[in-house]
Amino acid sequence: METASPGPLQSDLGKTTIADRVVQKIVGLAAREVPGIYDLGGGAARTLGAIRERIPGSSQTSGQGVSVEVGETQAAVDLEVVTEYGMSIADVAKSVRRNVISAVEGMTGLQVTEVNLSVNDIHLPGDDQEDSAQPARVQ
């Protein structure tokens, strides 16, 4: 019976463990790099992220909308995303998977077994513009 050779995270000199949070951050940043991704997370996660950004000293969490399971040699990823209107969702998903797998495997040495995407919303042009031309309804 053959035994698997140790991966880059385990050697005769010791073992390296990588926290879920580290993989979560790598995944979040790699997903955001893909053209066609507007944001990560569902509605509630994005709302909390927007509130968090307004608090002095806080920063946007790169792990928002990202869930990972990390084992000794493998990782599985679940992502919730918002895509840009007009982009092919299938092409964006393919690019996200490719970028996430490349980033995680390249930076950690973990084998990514799956990258599951849930597209929760589509960002429409003009969604970010506040309509200040309309007068307030209540004075």
State where each predicted segment sits.
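Short, non-transmembrane amphipathic alpha-helical segments
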Residues: 27, 89-108, 112
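Short acidic amphipathic segments
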Residues: 31-40, 110
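Short edge beta-strands and adjacent turn/loop segments
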Residues: 44-80, 124
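A short interface-forming secondary-structure element
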Residues: 72-94
